[in-house]
């Protein structure tokens, strides 16, 4: 196979050195140099169906024409820009909550928007969405449907998998969750010694942890405060140890969340929790028989393993192979959420997601929030070469949202092979990072404002706070609005000069020395997402919006967004290394680095 570089032609006439914008030809199509220089290792067998689209060629031309145009010029030319490049979706709630997207602070104009919408059409996005909603096996590498939408199908319309309506089974599990969660919340469910449950410990990892953690944190104002929730995910013994120190084990319910009930991290932690319970009872001379069934429930599909663990089958909550881990918070995996906020609020969470499902399936493309969000992202990733995307929630309750969206986006679209089995010919999923509110401003916003990488941002805020304390929320939201504006408009050298002179600086030398440091070039893009208030319904809408954004981007790139083979290799190697971690043992069957690290561990770990 020839090297990818052998197939490239750098247009030196338009290189950065000559003041133009470099491009590289793959076949007959020119891709921006800043994009292709990152695609090392992509060979002649690359999948070029995306880059062969007429709309892709048009977008490349539009990038060359408008890519350097300051965003603020669009606002100067159009006083209604903010209104024209925004969409409001009613969530259908009594409190008149809504989801509002403003994408006007982007390098977008009508021509670019039309070309992006044509790209979605050329890539068959509407047809793909219909395939997903019909229950077709769109997860091709695992031959599975992708039907988390069925879990929040509040219309209760039939949804079929292999000719069978899944809604009766979905509703049955939801009713089972309702009955059990109400027993825990009311104190009817007792531990082995007769104490009511006051602590709930969820043991899971990945999708079995990130979604429940994020949602219970986000919806704390709706929680039952005399129940404390804890989450154990890391196989580092410190995680389970610290949680066990903080609870009354006689009043604790452990939720073991593992579809197969064989996940190494989860089962290791669950066994340690079971050992802690049994050791506690034995140390006090209490008969341990039947105790595990009183203190453990399972979110799993493996009946046999659950029974072997000691959990009553009646307390096993099922879900299905068409529910992917990172899309599972709507399923039985959401049991800790329901225990925390109650059945009615959990249904509100599902309803918010369902509203966006309906919007996504039926709204016209030019008003379709997940579609627009995805297309703006593709524009920046594939034409501006953006490799990171910041999630910036201005609501402390959403502090775990960036971590949740890291898995959702990066595990879904962090791939370099298309559904055809060929390598991609473009960049795919970005690095997702973020932090809540003004904390991020004092950590990494410096790089977003003045760094050398273009980092598109999503600012997420609520108009009404759940905690009305003095002027806190006004101060908070003034920063929210200011940051989106500052990133876009920047600050020119002349503005800096006037500011320094107004502050009393008279030395031209000092002013000239400070000018480059205090200048902001601006043109840093952002989306603004506003809700009226952070309710269960609003949270459901936000999460569903991002799920569908990921779907659209994956479909445009031609990758399978619903498998995660990249998670497996390290796990396999870890299983072979585990028996080698023994005091005094020397290994030499790895590379010299890994051999040395293992040998150092074996030499010192037992001391």
Curated annotation (Swiss-Prot):
This is Glucose-6-phosphate isomerase, glycosomal. Its EC number is 5.3.1.9. Homodimer. One of its GO terms (biological process) is glycolytic process. The keyword Iron-sulfur does not apply. A motif (Microbody targeting signal) lies at residues 605-607. It catalyses: alpha-D-glucose 6-phosphate = beta-D-fructose 6-phosphate. GO terms for molecular function: carbohydrate derivative binding; glucose-6-phosphate isomerase activity; monosaccharide binding. CDD domains: SIS_PGI_1 (cd05015), SIS_PGI_2 (cd05016). It is found in: Glycosome. Pfam families: PGI. GO terms for cellular component: cytosol; glycosome. The active site is at 411 (proton donor), 442, 571. Keywords: Gluconeogenesis, Glycolysis, Glycosome, Isomerase, Peroxisome. Belongs to the GPI family. Gene3D superfamilies: 1.10.1390.10, Glucose-6-phosphate isomerase like protein, domain 1. Pathway: Carbohydrate degradation; glycolysis; D-glyceraldehyde 3-phosphate and glycerone phosphate from D-glucose: step 2/4. PROSITE patterns: P_GLUCOSE_ISOMERASE_1, P_GLUCOSE_ISOMERASE_2, P_GLUCOSE_ISOMERASE_3. PANTHER family: GLUCOSE-6-PHOSPHATE ISOMERASE (PTHR11469:SF1). It comes from Trypanosoma brucei brucei.
């Amino acid at each position: 196979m020839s090297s990818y570089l052998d197939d490239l032609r750098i247009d030196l006439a338009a290189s950065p050195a000559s003041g133009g914008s470099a491009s590289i030809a793959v076949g007959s199509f020119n891709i921006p140099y800043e994009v292709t220089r990152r695609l090392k290792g992509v060979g002649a067998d690359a999948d070029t169906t995306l880059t062969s689209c007429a709309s892709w060629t048009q977008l490349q031309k539009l990038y060359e024409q408008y890519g350097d145009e300051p965003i603020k010029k669009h606002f100067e030319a159009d006083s209604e820009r903010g209104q024209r490049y925004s969409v409001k979706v009613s969530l259908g709630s009594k409190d008149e909550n809504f989801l509002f997207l403003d994408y006007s602070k982007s390098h977008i104009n009508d021509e670019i928007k039309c070309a992006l919408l044509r790209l979605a059409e050329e890539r068959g996005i509407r047809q793909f969405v219909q395939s997903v909603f019909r229950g077709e096996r769109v997860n091709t590498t695992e031959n599975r449907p992708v039907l988390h939408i069925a879990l929040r199908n509040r219309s209760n319309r039939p949804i079929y998998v292999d000719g069978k309506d899944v809604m009766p089974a979905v509703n049955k599990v939801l009713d089972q969750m309702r009955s059990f969660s109400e027993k825990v919340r009311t104190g009817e469910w007792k531990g082995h010694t007769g104490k009511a449950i006051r602590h709930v410990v969820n043991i899971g990892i990945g999708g079995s942890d990130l979604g429940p953690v994020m949602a219970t944190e986000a919806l704390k104002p709706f929680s039952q405060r005399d129940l404390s929730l804890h989450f154990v995910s890391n196989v580092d013994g410190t995680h389970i140890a610290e949680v066990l120190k903080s609870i009354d084990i006689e009043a604790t319910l452990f939720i073991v969340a593992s579809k197969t009930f064989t996940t190494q991290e989860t089962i290791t932690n669950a066994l340690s929790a079971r050992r802690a319970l049994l050791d506690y009872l034995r140390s006090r001379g209490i008969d341990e028989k039947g105790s595990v069934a009183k203190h453990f429930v399972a979110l799993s599909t493996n009946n046999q393993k659950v029974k072997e663990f000691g959990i009553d089958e009646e307390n096993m909550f099922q879900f299905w192979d068409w529910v992917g881990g990172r899309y599972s918070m709507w399923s039985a995996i959401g049991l800790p959420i329901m225990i925390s906020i109650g059945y009615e609020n959990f249904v509100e969470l599902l309803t918010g997601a369902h509203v966006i499902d309906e919007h996504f399936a039926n709204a016209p493309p030019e008003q379709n929030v997940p579609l627009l969000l995805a297309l703006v992202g593709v524009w920046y990733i594939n034409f501006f070469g953006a490799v990171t995307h910041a999630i910036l929630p201005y609501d402390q309750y959403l502090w775990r949202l960036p971590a949740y969206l890291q898995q959702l986006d990066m595990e879904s679209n962090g791939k370099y092979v298309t559904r055809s089995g060929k390598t991609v010919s473009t960049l795919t999923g970005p690095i997702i990072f973020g932090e809540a509110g003004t904390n991020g401003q004092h950590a990494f916003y410096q790089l977003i404002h003045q760094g050398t990488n273009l980092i598109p941002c999503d600012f997420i805020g609520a108009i009404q706070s759940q905690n009305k304390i003095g002027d806190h929320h006004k101060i908070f939201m003034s920063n929210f609005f200011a940051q989106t504006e500052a990133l876009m408009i920047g600050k020119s050298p002349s503005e800096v000069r006037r500011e320094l002179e107004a502050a009393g600086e008279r030395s031209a030398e000092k002013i000239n020395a400070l000018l480059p440091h205090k200048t902001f070039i601006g043109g840093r893009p952002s989306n603004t997402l506003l809700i009226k208030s952070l309710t269960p319904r609003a949270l459901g809408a936000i999460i569903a919006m991002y799920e569908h954004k990921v779907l659209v981007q994956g479909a445009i790139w031609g990758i399978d967004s619903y498998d995660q083979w990249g998670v497996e290799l390290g796990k396999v190697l870890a299983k072979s290394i585990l028996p080698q971690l023994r005091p005094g043992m020397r290994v030499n069957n790895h590379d010299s680095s890994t051999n040395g690290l293992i040998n150092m561990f074996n030499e010192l770990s037992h001391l």
